[in-house]
Amino acid sequence: MAAFKLDFLPEMMVDHCSLNSSPVSKKMNGTLDHPDQPDLDAIKMFVGQVPRTWSEKDLRELFEQYGAVYEINVLRDRSQNPPQSKGCCFVTFYTRKAALEAQNALHNMKVLPGMHHPIQMKPADSEKNNAVEDRKLFIGMISKKCTENDIRVMFSSFGQIEECRILWGPDGLSRGCALVTFTTRAMAQTAIKAMHQAQTMEGCSSPMVVKFADTQKDKEQKRMAQQLQQQMQQISAASVWGNLAGLNTLGPQYLALYLQLLQQTASSGNLNTLSSLHPMGGLNAMQLQNLAALAAAASAAQNTPSGTNALTTSSSPLSVLTSSGSSPSSSSSNSVNPIASLGALQTLAGATAGLNVGSLAGMAALNGGLGSSGLSNGTGSTMEALTQAYSGIQQYAAAALPTLYNQNLLTQQSIGAAGSQKEGPEGANLFIYHLPQEFGDQDLLQMFMPFGNVVSAKVFIDKQTNLSKCFGFVSYDNPVSAQAAIQSMNGFQIGMKRLKVQLKRSKNDSKPY
Protein backbone atom coordinates (compact mmCIF):
# COMPACT_ATOMS: atom_id res chain seq x y z
CA MET A 1 0.00 0.00 0.00
CA ALA A 2 2.79 2.36 0.91
CA ALA A 3 4.62 1.52 -2.28
CA PHE A 4 1.51 2.40 -4.27
CA LYS A 5 1.36 5.78 -2.59
CA LEU A 6 5.00 6.48 -3.32
CA ASP A 7 4.52 5.55 -6.96
CA PHE A 8 1.31 7.55 -7.30
CA LEU A 9 2.31 10.83 -5.68
CA PRO A 10 5.03 11.75 -8.19
CA GLU A 11 2.52 11.28 -11.00
CA MET A 12 0.13 13.66 -9.24
CA MET A 13 2.95 16.17 -8.83
CA VAL A 14 3.84 15.91 -12.52
CA ASP A 15 0.23 16.43 -13.55
CA HIS A 16 -0.05 19.42 -11.23
CA CYS A 17 3.06 21.00 -12.68
CA SER A 18 1.86 20.44 -16.21
CA LEU A 19 -1.39 22.17 -15.39
CA ASN A 20 0.41 25.25 -14.10
CA SER A 21 2.64 25.38 -17.15
CA SER A 22 -0.22 25.25 -19.66
CA PRO A 23 -1.31 28.35 -21.68
CA VAL A 24 -4.39 28.68 -19.47
CA SER A 25 -3.39 31.01 -16.63
CA LYS A 26 -5.22 32.35 -13.63
CA LYS A 27 -6.63 35.85 -13.55
CA MET A 28 -6.36 38.15 -10.58
CA ASN A 29 -9.91 37.32 -9.48
CA GLY A 30 -9.13 33.60 -9.49
CA THR A 31 -11.10 32.49 -12.56
CA LEU A 32 -9.37 30.76 -15.44
CA ASP A 33 -8.45 32.93 -18.38
CA HIS A 34 -8.98 31.90 -22.01
CA PRO A 35 -6.06 30.65 -24.10
CA ASP A 36 -4.58 32.59 -27.01
CA GLN A 37 -7.53 33.97 -29.03
CA PRO A 38 -11.09 35.15 -28.19
CA ASP A 39 -14.14 33.21 -29.33
CA LEU A 40 -15.18 33.46 -32.98
CA ASP A 41 -18.28 35.48 -32.09
CA ALA A 42 -16.50 37.84 -29.67
CA ILE A 43 -17.33 41.55 -30.04
CA LYS A 44 -14.91 44.46 -30.12
CA MET A 45 -16.55 47.25 -28.10
CA PHE A 46 -16.00 51.00 -28.27
CA VAL A 47 -16.09 52.71 -24.86
CA GLY A 48 -16.41 56.46 -24.40
CA GLN A 49 -16.63 58.83 -21.42
CA VAL A 50 -13.66 57.36 -19.55
CA PRO A 51 -11.20 59.55 -17.61
CA ARG A 52 -8.22 60.69 -19.66
CA THR A 53 -5.94 59.80 -16.76
CA TRP A 54 -6.94 56.14 -16.77
CA SER A 55 -4.45 53.61 -18.09
CA GLU A 56 -5.04 50.19 -19.66
CA LYS A 57 -4.56 48.67 -16.22
CA ASP A 58 -7.31 50.83 -14.69
CA LEU A 59 -9.68 49.94 -17.52
CA ARG A 60 -8.87 46.24 -17.28
CA GLU A 61 -9.83 46.24 -13.60
CA LEU A 62 -13.16 47.81 -14.55
CA PHE A 63 -13.99 45.43 -17.38
CA GLU A 64 -12.74 42.17 -15.84
CA GLN A 65 -15.66 42.29 -13.42
CA TYR A 66 -17.77 41.06 -16.33
CA GLY A 67 -15.43 38.52 -17.92
CA ALA A 68 -11.97 37.80 -19.22
CA VAL A 69 -10.51 40.64 -21.29
CA TYR A 70 -8.46 39.79 -24.36
CA GLU A 71 -7.29 43.28 -25.34
CA ILE A 72 -7.69 46.95 -24.41
CA ASN A 73 -6.57 49.74 -26.71
CA VAL A 74 -6.73 53.31 -25.38
CA LEU A 75 -7.11 55.89 -28.16
CA ARG A 76 -4.43 58.56 -27.83
CA ASP A 77 -3.71 61.94 -29.38
CA ARG A 78 -0.36 61.40 -31.12
CA SER A 79 0.10 65.11 -31.78
CA GLN A 80 0.98 65.62 -28.11
CA ASN A 81 4.22 64.58 -26.48
CA PRO A 82 3.79 62.24 -24.76
CA PRO A 83 0.54 61.10 -26.46
CA GLN A 84 -2.51 61.82 -24.30
CA SER A 85 -5.63 59.70 -23.91
CA LYS A 86 -8.70 60.90 -25.83
CA GLY A 87 -11.00 59.58 -23.11
CA CYS A 88 -12.11 56.52 -25.06
CA CYS A 89 -10.90 53.03 -25.85
CA PHE A 90 -11.61 49.70 -27.53
CA VAL A 91 -12.05 46.57 -25.44
CA THR A 92 -12.34 42.98 -26.65
CA PHE A 93 -13.58 40.26 -24.29
CA TYR A 94 -12.85 36.59 -24.86
CA THR A 95 -16.58 35.85 -25.04
CA ARG A 96 -19.54 37.59 -26.61
CA LYS A 97 -21.54 37.03 -23.44
CA ALA A 98 -19.05 38.99 -21.31
CA ALA A 99 -19.12 41.93 -23.74
CA LEU A 100 -22.92 42.11 -23.70
CA GLU A 101 -23.05 41.83 -19.91
CA ALA A 102 -20.55 44.69 -19.61
CA GLN A 103 -22.58 46.80 -22.03
CA ASN A 104 -25.82 46.16 -20.12
CA ALA A 105 -24.17 47.11 -16.83
CA LEU A 106 -22.18 50.15 -17.99
CA HIS A 107 -23.76 51.83 -21.03
CA ASN A 108 -25.62 54.96 -19.87
CA MET A 109 -25.56 53.47 -16.36
CA LYS A 110 -22.21 54.13 -14.67
CA VAL A 111 -20.44 57.50 -14.35
CA LEU A 112 -16.71 57.16 -13.77
CA PRO A 113 -14.83 59.44 -11.33
CA GLY A 114 -14.29 62.94 -12.68
CA MET A 115 -16.76 62.49 -15.55
CA HIS A 116 -20.08 64.31 -16.03
CA HIS A 117 -21.76 61.77 -18.31
CA PRO A 118 -22.23 57.99 -18.07
CA ILE A 119 -20.10 55.50 -19.97
CA GLN A 120 -20.98 55.00 -23.63
CA MET A 121 -20.38 51.42 -24.71
CA LYS A 122 -21.38 49.92 -28.05
CA PRO A 123 -19.99 47.58 -30.71
CA ALA A 124 -17.21 49.20 -32.71
CA ASP A 125 -17.97 50.24 -36.29
CA SER A 126 -16.01 47.25 -37.55
CA GLU A 127 -18.51 44.98 -35.78
CA LYS A 128 -21.60 46.43 -37.45
CA ASN A 129 -21.10 44.26 -40.50
CA ASN A 130 -21.65 41.24 -38.26
CA ALA A 131 -24.65 42.53 -36.28
CA VAL A 132 -27.09 39.90 -35.02
CA GLU A 133 -29.94 41.32 -37.10
CA ASP A 134 -27.86 40.71 -40.23
CA ARG A 135 -27.43 37.04 -39.36
CA LYS A 136 -30.82 36.14 -37.92
CA LEU A 137 -33.31 34.22 -40.07
CA PHE A 138 -37.05 33.87 -39.73
CA ILE A 139 -38.25 30.36 -40.61
CA GLY A 140 -41.96 30.17 -41.34
CA MET A 141 -44.33 27.40 -42.41
CA ILE A 142 -42.62 24.68 -40.37
CA SER A 143 -44.48 21.76 -38.87
CA LYS A 144 -45.82 22.42 -35.39
CA LYS A 145 -44.36 19.07 -34.42
CA CYS A 146 -40.80 20.31 -35.04
CA THR A 147 -38.52 20.80 -32.06
CA GLU A 148 -35.55 23.16 -31.77
CA ASN A 149 -33.26 20.19 -32.29
CA ASP A 150 -35.07 19.33 -35.53
CA ILE A 151 -34.53 22.87 -36.81
CA ARG A 152 -30.85 22.80 -35.82
CA VAL A 153 -30.33 19.55 -37.69
CA MET A 154 -32.14 20.97 -40.72
CA PHE A 155 -29.96 24.11 -40.92
CA SER A 156 -26.65 23.00 -39.40
CA SER A 157 -25.28 22.03 -42.81
CA PHE A 158 -25.10 25.72 -43.77
CA GLY A 159 -22.80 26.77 -40.93
CA GLN A 160 -22.44 27.24 -37.20
CA ILE A 161 -25.73 28.11 -35.51
CA GLU A 162 -25.46 30.62 -32.69
CA GLU A 163 -29.08 30.44 -31.57
CA CYS A 164 -32.19 28.49 -32.53
CA ARG A 165 -35.59 29.22 -31.04
CA ILE A 166 -39.12 28.01 -31.77
CA LEU A 167 -41.78 30.72 -31.36
CA TRP A 168 -44.56 29.68 -29.02
CA GLY A 169 -48.09 31.02 -28.70
CA PRO A 170 -49.82 32.01 -25.44
CA ASP A 171 -51.46 28.57 -25.41
CA GLY A 172 -48.06 26.92 -25.18
CA LEU A 173 -48.26 25.50 -28.70
CA SER A 174 -45.81 26.12 -31.51
CA ARG A 175 -46.71 28.93 -33.91
CA GLY A 176 -45.14 27.04 -36.77
CA CYS A 177 -42.14 29.37 -37.05
CA ALA A 178 -38.67 29.78 -35.62
CA LEU A 179 -35.65 32.09 -35.44
CA VAL A 180 -32.19 30.84 -36.38
CA THR A 181 -29.04 32.95 -35.92
CA PHE A 182 -25.84 31.97 -37.74
CA THR A 183 -22.36 33.20 -36.84
CA THR A 184 -21.93 34.96 -40.21
CA ARG A 185 -24.24 36.63 -42.70
CA ALA A 186 -22.83 34.52 -45.52
CA MET A 187 -24.06 31.37 -43.81
CA ALA A 188 -27.52 32.90 -43.42
CA GLN A 189 -27.64 33.87 -47.10
CA THR A 190 -26.65 30.36 -48.14
CA ALA A 191 -29.45 28.93 -46.00
CA ILE A 192 -31.99 31.28 -47.61
CA LYS A 193 -30.96 30.28 -51.14
CA ALA A 194 -31.12 26.58 -50.35
CA MET A 195 -34.17 26.35 -48.09
CA HIS A 196 -36.62 29.10 -49.04
CA GLN A 197 -39.74 27.42 -50.49
CA ALA A 198 -37.73 24.23 -50.97
CA GLN A 199 -40.24 21.95 -49.22
CA THR A 200 -43.71 21.86 -47.75
CA MET A 201 -43.75 20.41 -44.26
CA GLU A 202 -46.42 18.31 -42.60
CA GLY A 203 -49.53 20.28 -41.66
CA CYS A 204 -48.49 23.37 -43.66
CA SER A 205 -50.51 24.87 -46.52
CA SER A 206 -47.55 26.39 -48.37
CA PRO A 207 -43.77 25.89 -48.74
CA MET A 208 -41.31 26.82 -46.03
CA VAL A 209 -40.42 30.51 -45.77
CA VAL A 210 -36.80 31.39 -45.02
CA LYS A 211 -35.84 35.08 -44.90
CA PHE A 212 -33.93 37.57 -42.79
CA ALA A 213 -35.85 38.38 -39.62
CA ASP A 214 -37.43 41.81 -39.34
CA THR A 215 -35.26 44.44 -37.70
CA GLN A 216 -36.62 46.76 -35.03
CA LYS A 217 -37.02 49.46 -37.69
CA ASP A 218 -39.02 47.10 -39.90
CA LYS A 219 -41.29 46.20 -37.00
CA GLU A 220 -41.88 49.87 -36.20
CA GLN A 221 -42.83 50.64 -39.80
CA LYS A 222 -45.27 47.74 -39.91
CA ARG A 223 -46.83 48.87 -36.64
CA MET A 224 -47.35 52.40 -37.97
CA ALA A 225 -48.74 51.07 -41.23
CA GLN A 226 -51.22 48.96 -39.29
CA GLN A 227 -52.32 51.96 -37.22
CA LEU A 228 -52.84 54.02 -40.37
CA GLN A 229 -54.80 51.24 -42.01
CA GLN A 230 -57.12 51.04 -39.00
CA GLN A 231 -57.64 54.82 -39.08
CA MET A 232 -58.45 54.72 -42.77
CA GLN A 233 -60.87 51.83 -42.37
CA GLN A 234 -62.75 53.71 -39.65
CA ILE A 235 -63.00 56.82 -41.80
CA SER A 236 -63.90 54.79 -44.87
CA ALA A 237 -66.77 53.13 -43.03
CA ALA A 238 -68.29 56.52 -42.29
CA SER A 239 -67.62 58.33 -45.53
CA VAL A 240 -66.05 55.95 -48.07
CA TRP A 241 -63.55 58.81 -48.52
CA GLY A 242 -66.17 60.58 -50.56
CA ASN A 243 -67.95 62.71 -47.99
CA LEU A 244 -65.26 65.04 -46.71
CA ALA A 245 -67.27 65.86 -43.62
CA GLY A 246 -66.38 62.36 -42.43
CA LEU A 247 -62.78 63.46 -41.93
CA ASN A 248 -63.57 65.14 -38.61
CA THR A 249 -61.82 62.29 -36.82
CA LEU A 250 -58.46 63.17 -38.35
CA GLY A 251 -56.18 64.98 -35.93
CA PRO A 252 -52.63 66.33 -36.07
CA GLN A 253 -51.35 63.11 -34.50
CA TYR A 254 -52.68 61.22 -37.52
CA LEU A 255 -51.09 63.64 -39.96
CA ALA A 256 -47.78 63.50 -38.10
CA LEU A 257 -47.89 59.70 -38.09
CA TYR A 258 -48.68 59.75 -41.80
CA LEU A 259 -45.68 62.00 -42.41
CA GLN A 260 -43.35 59.89 -40.29
CA LEU A 261 -44.25 56.71 -42.16
CA LEU A 262 -43.83 58.39 -45.54
CA GLN A 263 -40.45 59.85 -44.57
CA GLN A 264 -39.12 56.52 -43.36
CA THR A 265 -40.48 54.72 -46.39
CA ALA A 266 -39.05 57.28 -48.81
CA SER A 267 -35.62 57.13 -47.18
CA SER A 268 -35.53 53.34 -47.08
CA GLY A 269 -37.08 52.80 -50.50
CA ASN A 270 -39.34 50.11 -49.04
CA LEU A 271 -42.57 51.12 -50.78
CA ASN A 272 -44.16 47.75 -50.04
CA THR A 273 -45.05 49.09 -46.60
CA LEU A 274 -47.59 51.42 -48.22
CA SER A 275 -49.03 48.92 -50.69
CA SER A 276 -52.20 48.43 -48.67
CA LEU A 277 -52.82 52.15 -48.10
CA HIS A 278 -54.57 52.99 -51.36
CA PRO A 279 -55.53 56.59 -50.48
CA MET A 280 -51.82 57.38 -50.18
CA GLY A 281 -51.01 56.43 -53.75
CA GLY A 282 -51.00 60.00 -55.05
CA LEU A 283 -48.24 61.19 -52.72
CA ASN A 284 -44.56 61.11 -53.55
CA ALA A 285 -41.34 62.12 -51.83
CA MET A 286 -41.55 65.66 -53.25
CA GLN A 287 -44.82 66.19 -51.37
CA LEU A 288 -43.58 65.14 -47.93
CA GLN A 289 -42.53 68.70 -47.17
CA ASN A 290 -46.05 69.89 -47.74
CA LEU A 291 -47.54 67.16 -45.58
CA ALA A 292 -45.24 68.33 -42.80
CA ALA A 293 -46.78 71.78 -43.17
CA LEU A 294 -50.24 70.27 -42.86
CA ALA A 295 -49.32 68.44 -39.67
CA ALA A 296 -47.75 71.55 -38.15
CA ALA A 297 -50.71 73.69 -39.18
CA ALA A 298 -53.19 71.21 -37.76
CA SER A 299 -51.32 71.09 -34.48
CA ALA A 300 -51.14 74.90 -34.29
CA ALA A 301 -54.83 75.25 -35.02
CA GLN A 302 -55.83 72.67 -32.44
CA ASN A 303 -53.56 74.06 -29.73
CA THR A 304 -54.82 77.64 -30.11
CA PRO A 305 -58.38 77.95 -28.73
CA SER A 306 -58.94 81.39 -30.20
CA GLY A 307 -57.71 80.19 -33.56
CA THR A 308 -60.13 77.28 -33.45
CA ASN A 309 -63.05 79.61 -32.82
CA ALA A 310 -62.08 81.65 -35.83
CA LEU A 311 -61.82 78.53 -37.93
CA THR A 312 -65.27 77.29 -37.05
CA THR A 313 -66.89 80.45 -38.37
CA SER A 314 -65.17 80.32 -41.71
CA SER A 315 -66.94 81.50 -44.83
CA SER A 316 -63.99 80.84 -47.12
CA PRO A 317 -64.02 78.74 -50.29
CA LEU A 318 -62.65 75.82 -48.26
CA SER A 319 -66.01 75.43 -46.55
CA VAL A 320 -67.37 74.24 -49.89
CA LEU A 321 -65.21 71.16 -49.49
CA THR A 322 -66.89 70.11 -46.27
CA SER A 323 -70.45 70.62 -47.47
CA SER A 324 -70.85 68.57 -50.61
CA GLY A 325 -73.20 70.14 -53.07
CA SER A 326 -73.78 73.37 -51.19
CA SER A 327 -73.71 76.69 -52.95
CA PRO A 328 -71.24 79.48 -52.18
CA SER A 329 -73.96 81.48 -50.53
CA SER A 330 -74.98 78.69 -48.19
CA SER A 331 -71.45 77.64 -47.31
CA SER A 332 -71.02 80.51 -44.89
CA SER A 333 -73.57 79.03 -42.53
CA ASN A 334 -71.76 75.71 -42.23
CA SER A 335 -69.36 75.13 -39.36
CA VAL A 336 -65.96 73.95 -40.51
CA ASN A 337 -63.84 71.75 -38.26
CA PRO A 338 -60.23 72.96 -38.66
CA ILE A 339 -58.77 69.49 -38.45
CA ALA A 340 -61.31 68.18 -40.94
CA SER A 341 -60.34 70.95 -43.34
CA LEU A 342 -56.68 70.05 -43.13
CA GLY A 343 -57.52 66.38 -43.36
CA ALA A 344 -59.62 67.06 -46.43
CA LEU A 345 -56.66 68.66 -48.15
CA GLN A 346 -54.45 65.71 -47.25
CA THR A 347 -57.03 63.28 -48.62
CA LEU A 348 -57.34 65.14 -51.90
CA ALA A 349 -53.57 65.23 -52.35
CA GLY A 350 -53.59 62.06 -54.38
CA ALA A 351 -56.00 63.57 -56.90
CA THR A 352 -54.07 66.77 -57.46
CA ALA A 353 -51.16 67.50 -59.73
CA GLY A 354 -49.21 68.73 -56.68
CA LEU A 355 -49.94 69.34 -53.04
CA ASN A 356 -48.26 72.73 -52.68
CA VAL A 357 -51.11 75.00 -53.67
CA GLY A 358 -53.57 72.62 -52.09
CA SER A 359 -51.82 72.88 -48.77
CA LEU A 360 -52.05 76.65 -48.98
CA ALA A 361 -55.80 76.31 -49.24
CA GLY A 362 -55.72 75.13 -45.64
CA MET A 363 -55.11 78.75 -44.73
CA ALA A 364 -58.49 79.73 -46.06
CA ALA A 365 -60.37 78.13 -43.21
CA LEU A 366 -58.56 80.48 -40.89
CA ASN A 367 -58.51 83.59 -43.02
CA GLY A 368 -62.22 83.69 -43.72
CA GLY A 369 -63.04 83.76 -40.03
CA LEU A 370 -60.57 86.39 -38.94
CA GLY A 371 -61.91 89.85 -38.40
CA SER A 372 -60.03 92.91 -37.20
CA SER A 373 -60.89 91.95 -33.64
CA GLY A 374 -59.64 88.44 -34.26
CA LEU A 375 -56.25 89.71 -35.30
CA SER A 376 -55.98 91.79 -32.15
CA ASN A 377 -57.25 89.25 -29.60
CA GLY A 378 -54.67 86.55 -30.16
CA THR A 379 -55.80 84.59 -33.20
CA GLY A 380 -52.92 86.13 -35.05
CA SER A 381 -50.62 83.69 -33.25
CA THR A 382 -52.28 80.85 -35.08
CA MET A 383 -51.82 82.67 -38.37
CA GLU A 384 -48.13 83.08 -37.57
CA ALA A 385 -47.80 79.39 -36.78
CA LEU A 386 -49.52 78.48 -40.03
CA THR A 387 -47.35 80.89 -42.00
CA GLN A 388 -44.22 79.36 -40.50
CA ALA A 389 -45.51 75.88 -41.28
CA TYR A 390 -45.85 76.72 -44.94
CA SER A 391 -42.61 78.69 -45.21
CA GLY A 392 -40.70 75.58 -46.25
CA ILE A 393 -42.80 74.87 -49.33
CA GLN A 394 -40.46 75.34 -52.30
CA GLN A 395 -42.39 74.09 -55.31
CA TYR A 396 -45.57 75.41 -56.88
CA ALA A 397 -48.12 73.73 -59.15
CA ALA A 398 -50.87 76.04 -60.32
CA ALA A 399 -52.75 73.21 -61.99
CA ALA A 400 -53.48 71.66 -58.59
CA LEU A 401 -55.84 74.33 -57.32
CA PRO A 402 -58.90 73.78 -59.55
CA THR A 403 -59.25 70.21 -58.29
CA LEU A 404 -59.58 71.47 -54.73
CA TYR A 405 -62.52 73.77 -55.33
CA ASN A 406 -66.03 73.53 -56.59
CA GLN A 407 -65.60 74.14 -60.33
CA ASN A 408 -68.74 76.28 -60.48
CA LEU A 409 -67.33 78.58 -57.83
CA LEU A 410 -64.02 78.87 -59.68
CA THR A 411 -65.78 79.61 -62.96
CA GLN A 412 -67.97 82.30 -61.39
CA GLN A 413 -64.96 84.05 -59.85
CA SER A 414 -62.93 83.67 -63.04
CA ILE A 415 -65.54 85.40 -65.17
CA GLY A 416 -65.61 88.49 -63.00
CA ALA A 417 -62.09 88.66 -61.56
CA ALA A 418 -59.50 87.39 -64.02
CA GLY A 419 -58.14 90.21 -66.16
CA SER A 420 -60.17 92.99 -64.55
CA GLN A 421 -58.72 95.93 -62.64
CA LYS A 422 -61.59 96.49 -60.24
CA GLU A 423 -60.29 97.64 -56.89
CA GLY A 424 -61.42 96.58 -53.45
CA PRO A 425 -61.66 98.73 -50.32
CA GLU A 426 -58.64 100.47 -48.83
CA GLY A 427 -56.07 97.93 -47.61
CA ALA A 428 -57.50 95.10 -49.73
CA ASN A 429 -55.44 95.68 -52.89
CA LEU A 430 -52.14 93.89 -53.43
CA PHE A 431 -49.12 94.40 -55.65
CA ILE A 432 -47.33 91.17 -56.65
CA TYR A 433 -43.83 91.21 -58.14
CA HIS A 434 -41.50 88.42 -59.41
CA LEU A 435 -44.28 86.49 -61.11
CA PRO A 436 -43.19 83.74 -63.55
CA GLN A 437 -43.02 84.94 -67.16
CA GLU A 438 -45.66 82.41 -68.24
CA PHE A 439 -48.22 83.42 -65.59
CA GLY A 440 -51.45 84.92 -66.84
CA ASP A 441 -54.49 86.47 -65.19
CA GLN A 442 -56.09 83.08 -64.56
CA ASP A 443 -52.94 81.72 -62.88
CA LEU A 444 -52.73 84.78 -60.63
CA LEU A 445 -56.37 84.36 -59.64
CA GLN A 446 -55.91 80.68 -58.83
CA MET A 447 -52.86 81.42 -56.71
CA PHE A 448 -54.60 84.00 -54.48
CA MET A 449 -58.11 82.54 -54.31
CA PRO A 450 -57.43 80.46 -51.18
CA PHE A 451 -57.20 83.57 -49.02
CA GLY A 452 -60.58 85.12 -49.72
CA ASN A 453 -62.96 86.49 -52.34
CA VAL A 454 -60.92 87.97 -55.21
CA VAL A 455 -62.65 90.82 -57.04
CA SER A 456 -59.88 91.31 -59.62
CA ALA A 457 -56.59 89.76 -60.70
CA LYS A 458 -54.47 91.33 -63.43
CA VAL A 459 -51.00 90.52 -64.81
CA PHE A 460 -49.47 93.47 -66.65
CA ILE A 461 -48.39 92.87 -70.26
CA ASP A 462 -45.79 94.80 -72.25
CA LYS A 463 -47.75 96.24 -75.21
CA GLN A 464 -44.76 96.11 -77.54
CA THR A 465 -43.56 92.55 -76.85
CA ASN A 466 -46.91 91.17 -75.64
CA LEU A 467 -44.99 89.47 -72.81
CA SER A 468 -45.65 89.61 -69.10
CA LYS A 469 -43.91 92.32 -67.11
CA CYS A 470 -43.76 89.78 -64.25
CA PHE A 471 -45.90 91.85 -61.90
CA GLY A 472 -49.59 92.27 -61.29
CA PHE A 473 -52.37 93.34 -58.94
CA VAL A 474 -54.90 91.37 -56.89
CA SER A 475 -57.83 92.94 -55.06
CA TYR A 476 -59.99 91.33 -52.36
CA ASP A 477 -63.32 92.45 -50.99
CA ASN A 478 -61.84 92.84 -47.47
CA PRO A 479 -58.47 93.85 -45.94
CA VAL A 480 -58.21 90.71 -43.78
CA SER A 481 -57.89 88.45 -46.82
CA ALA A 482 -55.23 90.76 -48.24
CA GLN A 483 -53.20 90.59 -45.02
CA ALA A 484 -53.52 86.81 -44.95
CA ALA A 485 -52.25 86.61 -48.53
CA ILE A 486 -49.28 88.84 -47.69
CA GLN A 487 -48.31 86.75 -44.66
CA SER A 488 -48.54 83.50 -46.60
CA MET A 489 -47.31 84.42 -50.08
CA ASN A 490 -44.68 87.12 -49.56
CA GLY A 491 -41.38 85.32 -50.07
CA PHE A 492 -43.10 82.24 -51.50
CA GLN A 493 -40.66 80.60 -53.92
CA ILE A 494 -41.69 79.81 -57.49
CA GLY A 495 -38.86 78.32 -59.50
CA MET A 496 -35.76 80.43 -58.87
CA LYS A 497 -37.62 83.53 -57.64
CA ARG A 498 -39.50 84.52 -54.52
CA LEU A 499 -42.74 86.46 -54.78
CA LYS A 500 -42.90 89.97 -53.42
CA VAL A 501 -46.41 90.63 -52.11
CA GLN A 502 -47.35 93.94 -50.51
CA LEU A 503 -50.23 96.38 -50.22
CA LYS A 504 -50.84 98.56 -53.24
CA ARG A 505 -50.23 102.19 -52.34
CA SER A 506 -53.02 104.70 -52.21
CA LYS A 507 -53.88 106.73 -55.32
CA ASN A 508 -52.76 109.81 -53.43
CA ASP A 509 -49.18 108.50 -53.33
CA SER A 510 -46.80 109.35 -56.14
CA LYS A 511 -46.21 105.64 -56.89
CA PRO A 512 -48.80 102.85 -56.88
CA TYR A 513 -46.18 100.52 -55.33
From Swiss-Prot:
Any one GO biological process: regulation of RNA splicing
Alphabetized Pfam families for the sequence: RRM_1
The keyword RNA-binding belongs to this UniProt entry's keyword annotation: yes
Location (main, coarse): nucleus
Database matches in Gene3D superfamilies: 3.30.70.330
InterPro entries (alphabetical): CELF1/2_RRM1 (IPR034196), CELF1/2_RRM2 (IPR034198), CELF1/2_RRM3 (IPR034199), Nucleotide-bd_a/b_plait_sf (IPR012677), RBD_domain_sf (IPR035979), RRM_dom (IPR000504)
Biased composition (Low complexity): 311-336
Highest taxon above the source species: Eukaryota
Keywords assigned: Activator, Cytoplasm, Isopeptide bond, mRNA processing, mRNA splicing, Nucleus, Phosphoprotein, Repeat, RNA-binding, Ubl conjugation
GO cellular component: cytoplasm; nucleus
Localization terms from the record: Nucleus; Cytoplasm
Residue span(s) of domain RRM: 43-126, 135-215, 428-506
Segments of this protein annotated with the region Disordered: 304-336
PROSITE patterns found in the cross-reference section: RRM
GO-annotated molecular function: RNA binding
Cross-link annotation Glycyl lysine isopeptide (Lys-Gly) (interchain with G-Cter in SUMO2), location: K136
Modified residues (Phosphothreonine): T31
UniProt modified residues of type Phosphoserine: S206, S329
Subunit-level organization: Associates with polysomes. Interacts with HNRNPH1; the interaction in RNA-dependent. Interacts with PARN. Component of an EIF2 complex at least composed of CELF1/CUGBP1, CALR, CALR3, EIF2S1, EIF2S2, HSP90B1 and HSPA5.
Function, in words: RNA-binding protein implicated in the regulation of several post-transcriptional events. Involved in pre-mRNA alternative splicing, mRNA translation and stability. Mediates exon inclusion and/or exclusion in pre-mRNA that are subject to tissue-specific and developmentally regulated alternative splicing. Specifically activates exon 5 inclusion of cardiac isoforms of TNNT2 during heart remodeling at the juvenile to adult transition.
Similarity comment text for this entry: Belongs to the CELF/BRUNOL family.
Domain observations: RRM1 and RRM2 domains preferentially target UGU(U/G)-rich mRNA elements.
The protein's name in its UniProt record: CUGBP Elav-like family member 1
Gene: CELF1
